[in-house]
Amino acid sequence: MILCDSDIELWMDEEKLDIIPRPPIERINGASVDILLGDKFRVFRGHTTAFVDLSGPKKNVTDAINLIMSNEIQLTEDDTFFLHPGELALAVTMESITLPNNLIGWLDGRSSLARLGLMVHITAQRIDPGWQGKIVLEIYNAGKLPLGLRPGMLIAALSFELLSGPASRPYHKRESAKYCYQQGAVASRIDQD
């Protein structure tokens, strides 16, 4: 069962679902909550790496990721981040989300942005029960023109689905929870698999 707008508000009122800062009622729709783009980004820097061997030794994978990813870029609210056609960047939501053990979240991009070529997530649309932290967005410009993105703009929507029971292995209690509590545009940690 997907939570409707009044249930989303009730779950937040009862502190079962935590979204900080709490969205105003205007951003809580029939079955979703509109979320905002945060102020932290990472991009692929200019490099001469021919490929990243994801099946290679972990140290080599770590070194390759560190070589190709920029340090975190933090914008002010007046700054604009330009994403050019064919470019991928990591960004973060403004909101920090905490899900209880019996609720899963789903991230969807906005249709208005998709119609301009902006993909908000490549494959990572599921937010596991027990999640705590900001959500990293894998944003890609599939359009023909550069797109200017600003912190605080509407970027995506979250919906919430009730599980048949509480998860016995919620995200924040798993040893493999390598992105739990993230607050910035965290680069891939595939080397920790």
From Swiss-Prot:
Name of the protein in its database record: dCTP deaminase
Q: What is the lineage of its organism?
A: Bacteria, Pseudomonadati, Pseudomonadota, Gammaproteobacteria, Candidatus Palibaumannia
The record's gene field reads: dcd
Which GO MF terms are attached to this record?
dCTP deaminase activity; nucleotide binding
Q: Where is the active site?
A: 138 (proton donor/acceptor)
GO biological process: what's one of them?
dUMP biosynthetic process
* Coiled coil region boundaries: none
Pathway(s): Pyrimidine metabolism; dUMP biosynthesis; dUMP from dCTP (dUTP route): step 1/2
Under catalytic activity, the entry for this protein gives: dCTP + H2O + H(+) = dUTP + NH4(+)
> Which InterPro entries does this one have?
dCTP_deaminase, dUTPase-like_sf, dUTPase_trimeric
